[in-house]
Amino acid sequence: MENRPRQQTSGHDCSLGTGDDLSSRPGRVDLLRAHISPTTVKQVSVNHERKVVGSSSSRSAVWGISPDGSNAFESKNFGLEGDSNHTVEHEVIKEEDSQKKSPFSCGSAPRVVDSPGASVVSREGRVGPPSDGSAVVSGDDETDANNSEDGTEDEIVSEEGRRTEDEGDVTSRSDQVPCTPPPMWVPEVLSDESEETPLRRVGEERHVSDSSSGGDGYLRGTRQGRVRPHAVPPLFHTPSHFTPVRATSSRLISLSSDSERMHRMAQKVQTQPEMKPKELDKEAERKQEQLRSSKGDNKGIFKGLLRQLTRGYTGVAHLFDGLASDFKPHTENEGSSSNDVLTEERTVQPSSAVVSDKRVTGNGTGVERFKPRVRHRLSQECRPSFPEKPDEETSLSTTLPTKLKSLFSFASSHWNHASPGEGEATEAAGASVSGSSSFLAANANHSPSMLDAYGRPPQKRTQRRSFFGSVAAAASNAFAEAGAVAAAAAEAVAAVGQSSSDSSGDSSSESDHSGRERSRAFRGKRGGSNEITTMRSQRSAGHLSFSREPERESDQGEMTPTGETSGSESELDQVILTEHATPFNFVLWATREAAASLQRPLLSGPPEEEAGNAEELRSTENAIHRRELQRLGRLRAVALRLLLLICEDDSWCQDGTTRQSAHKGANDGARRRFPPIVQGVRGRRRSDRDTESPPTEATQDSEEVDRLWSQWINGSPETEGGEDADRKQEEKRLQGRGVSRSRYMWKAANRMLSVDRRLRKLHSDTAVRRMGETEFWKLYFYQVFLLMNRFDRQAHKVLRSLSCSFTLTTGEGGDENQPQEVAHDVLSQTSGFTESDTSSPSPSYGFASSPCTSARLIIPPTGLPDNTEEGEPLSFGGVSLEPKDEEAPEQVRQDGLGALAYAIFSSSRSPSLSSSSSGTTSVSARGTGSSFSRDVGESPLLVPRDSHRSGVGSETYSAGGDSPALREKVISENAGCLPLGRAPSQPTNTVSSVSSNRAYLEPASRRGSFSVVPVSGRRLRDALFAKRVSSSSQVNGRVSTSRGTMGEDRHQDQQGDNRLEGPSHLSAHNSLYQLGSRSGNCVQIKVKELKELDGTCGDTHQPGLACKGKEVQGARA
C-alpha cells in the first residue's frame, strides 16, 4: 500500500492523478527540487505542493498548526522515505475526513491507500478547491510533508485521526495514538480543533498554510471548518512553497473531482465542532469574531503581513468597520482583533478570546468589569467608572495605541482612586462630558447619594445600548459630532470662563454641595474620572468602538432631559433618545443645552433659592454644578476627542517615554496636589514640553508660566520661541522619524487631560479662587500655550490647524451652525460675563482674530483684542489682543479661555464644527493651511492641496486619522477659520505670516503685521460684522475658502513670499477648494469662495465672519 500509494500518489503528483509509479519518484524528486529550489518545475512544485498541502492540511491544518514551512522542508527531507506511509495516512485522513469529519478506524487508511487515486482525487476534491488543490497532488509530497511535519504536527495535533488512522507506517510517528483510540479522541480533537481551528486557528492555519503550504493549511482548514477567518500566514511558510502555483494548479486539478468530498468534509468538520468543549468553542468563537471583525473583512485583501503592517491603522479601521457592521461590546475586541491588539488584550486579560466576552459579560478585564449595570454607573459615576475604566482600558488596549492606552490606563488608575464621595462629582463630570444633561436629570431626579450608590436607573442602560446601535450607525456622524462637540466645548469654555468669574459663588455653592467631592476632585480624582469619562467619550467618538461611552452618556442626557440645565435639553433629549440618535445629535443637543445653560442665571450663581432653604440651595448648587460639569465635560470631551482623533494614528500617541513622563508627573501631580492646576499644568506641561525631561519643579514651572504669560500678553514669543525653539528643532529632527510627533501627540493628550483637570478645578472655581483668576488663567493658558506650541511647531499639523481653527469656531463660525452660533453668542456672553470690556461683538471679533494670528499665543489675548479695540484693525490683528491681555490679563483669560477653549476644542474638530452643521469644513481646512500652513503648508503633509485631496470636512479627518491628507484637511478646515482672523492679520502680517511660518509663536511679528494691517483690520472688522450677519452662511463659507482667498490675496499682495500666500499656497487653495477666484486678489477669491462656500467659515475669523462675499469685500475694503 505504501509503495502503491506512493507510486500512485507520485504519479498523481507528476501527472496529477495518473498514478505513475515512475513519476512518483521523479515527481517527488521534482517536488523536493521544487521545495529546495522553488523555481524548479512549476508542475512538480505544484504537485509537491499539493501533496504537502494535502498532508499538511489534513494534519496541521486541523490542529491549527501551520505545518507549511515545516511540511515543505520536511517533505524535502523525508519526502522519499515516509512518503508512501504518510501519503497513505494523509490520503486516508483526507478520505476519511471527507467521508467523516470524525476520527476513522484504522481501516480508513487502507481504504484510502487502496484507492490512492481516489484518495488523491478526494484529497484533491477536498483540498484542491479550498486549498488551491495543492493537496490534490498525490499524497507522496503530502506524505513527505506529513512525515517531516508528522512527528511535530501530528504529535501536536495529538495524533489526530490521521496518525491514528495512519497504518503502522504513520504510527511510527503516531505511535502515541493507537489505531482504535483515534475514533474516540480524534472526533473530540477534531471537533475542538476543527471548530476552534476552522473558526480561528484553522482559519489562521489555513491562511498560513495556504500562503505557506500553497493551500495545504487552507485545505485542512476548509475540511475542518470551511471557515477561513483571517488566518495568519506562518512566518516560515512561503520560502519552500509556491502557494500561488500550488493553489492554482492543484485547485484546477482537484476542483472538479473532489469538490464534493471537500464540501462533505467541510460539512463534517463543521459538524465536529459541536463536539468541541464549550470553553474552547466560546474562546475560539470570540477570537474568531475578533479576528473576523478586525481581519475577516480584510482576510482576502490584507493578509497577515498586511495586517501586521497596517495593524495600527487596521485596528482603527476595524473599529469603525466593526461598529458599522455591528456595534457590540465586541467592537472593542474587534478593534483589538488585530494581532497586536489581541496580544495587548491578552496581556490585559488571560485570554484574548475571552477578552471580548469579559468586556461584554463583565468577566473583568484586569479590573472587574462589573455588570453592565456597573458600566452604566461607570459612565455616570466615578467609582463605577473606574471599574469600567479598566474595562475600557482593556478596550483601549485592544483598540487604541499603546500610548493612548497608557494614557487611559493612568487616567483609569486615578479613576480607581476615585472615592464614592468623589464619584458623585466625577460622575457628574463624566455625565456632563457626554450626557451632562442626563447627569443633571439624574441629580435632579436622584440625590447625589443615590448616584453615588449607583442609583442610575438600569433602564438607561437599555437606552444606551440602543444608542450603541445608533452610534454604530452614526460612526461617520461621530466625527461631525466631534465638531459639534467642539462648538459645545467652546460654549462650555466660554461658560467656564464666564462661570470662573460668575460661578465663584456658583462654585462655592457647588463646593458646598460637594465639598468632599471637590476636595477629592482637587486631588484630581473627580477630575481624573471626568477626564477619563471624557476620554472614553472622546474615545467612543474618535473610536467608534468606544461610542458606547458617549452613547451611554448621550443616552443619559437624552434619557434624563429633566435636568435643570435646559428646556431645549428635553427636546434634544427627545431627539437623542430616539433609536437613531447619533453622537452628533447628542452633540447638537449638548451644544444647545450648553447655550441655554449659559443663558441661565445659575451660572451666575445659585438662584434666590440659595438664600432660601438650604436644601433648595443645595439643589441649586447641584444644578449649577451639573451645568458647569456639563460644559466642562463637553469641553473635555472635545479635548479628549481631539486627543483621540490625533492619536487615532497610533504613532502619534505611542511614545512610551512621553507616556510615562506624562503619567508619572503631570497627571498624578495635577490630580493629587491642589495647585494641581498649577503643578499639574506645569508638571504635565513640563513633561509634555520635554518628554525626556521629567516635570520640573513647580517654581521653575511658575517662572516659565509667568514668562510665557508675559510673552503672551506682550506678544513676544521669543523666550517661548527660545525654549520651544530648541524643542522645535529637536522635534523637527525627530519628526522625520515620527518620534516627535508621537511624543508630542502623547504630550498633547496629557495636556488635554491636564486642561481637563484644570477646567474641572476651574469649574469648581476653587482653584481659581485660591490661585486667583489671573494666576489660574496664566497657568491654564500656559498649558494651552504649550499644547498649541507643541502642536503648532512640533507636532500635529492638525493640531496646529486646530489652534487656529478655534478662532473660526470662536468667532462667527459658531453662528453658522446653531451650536456654533450659540457658541458665538456664548462667547460674546462669556466675554461680557468674563469681564471682557468688549462683550459679544468684540469677543467674537477678537476670538476670530487672535487665533488666526497666533493660535497659541493669541489664545489668551483672544478676548483682549475685543477689549483692546474693536475699531483698531491692528489690535484686532491680534497685537491688541496680546497687549489687551497685558492690560486685562484676567479679561484676557476670560475671553482667552473661551477663545482658547474654542481654539483648542473647536480646533480639535474645527472641521467637524463647521462640517457638523455645514459640512463645508474641508474648505475651512484650507484656512488652516494658510494660518498654520505657514508651518503646515511648509510641511508636505499639510499642503493645502493635499488637504483638498484628502477630502473636505471632518469625514476625511475621521477617515484619515493621522493621514497627511486628513491632517491637511483638518488644517485646511482650521485654516478656514484662520484665514478670516488671519486674513485680516495676514494683509497686515503678511510678513507676520511668514514669521509665523518661522515660528508659530510670533504674535509679536504678527502684531507688527497687524500694525501693517490697520486697513485690513478694519476690513476684518467690517467683515466680522458682515460675517456675523452671514455667520449662518459662514458655516459653509467657513470652509475658509474665504480665508484662503482673503489670506491668499493678502499674502500674495503683501506677503507674496509667504509660502501660504505663495503660488503653491494659492494653487493649494485652488486645488483644495478649486475656487477659481482663489489665485488673484483676496477679495475676488474670498468673495467667490464665500459665495461658493456660502459664507467662508474660514473667514469666520474676521473675514470669515463675513462669510458672504460682501462681507469679504467689506473686510478687504
Curated annotation (Swiss-Prot):
Residues 752-788 form the BSD domain. It is found in: Cytoplasmic vesicle, Secretory vesicle, Rhoptry membrane. InterPro entries: BSD_dom (IPR005607), BSD_dom_sf (IPR035925). It comes from the Eukaryota. Residues 1-12, 530-540, 557-569, 829-838, 1031-1044 have a biased composition (Polar residues). Residues 1-27, 47-243, 258-301, 325-398, 415-442, 490-572, 600-619, 654-736, 829-848, 858-891, 909-964, 1031-1066, 1095-1117 are annotated as: Disordered. It is a peripheral membrane protein. Keywords: Cytoplasmic vesicle, Membrane. Its main location: membrane. Residues 418-442, 490-508, 839-848, 909-931 have a biased composition (Low complexity). Residues 83-100, 197-209, 275-300, 510-520, 546-555, 724-734, 1046-1062, 1108-1117 have a biased composition (Basic and acidic residues). Disruption phenotype: No defect in tachyzoite growth, intracellular replication and host cell invasion. One of its GO terms (cellular component) is cytoplasmic vesicle. The keyword Membrane applies. Interacts with RASP2. This is Rhoptry apical surface protein 3.
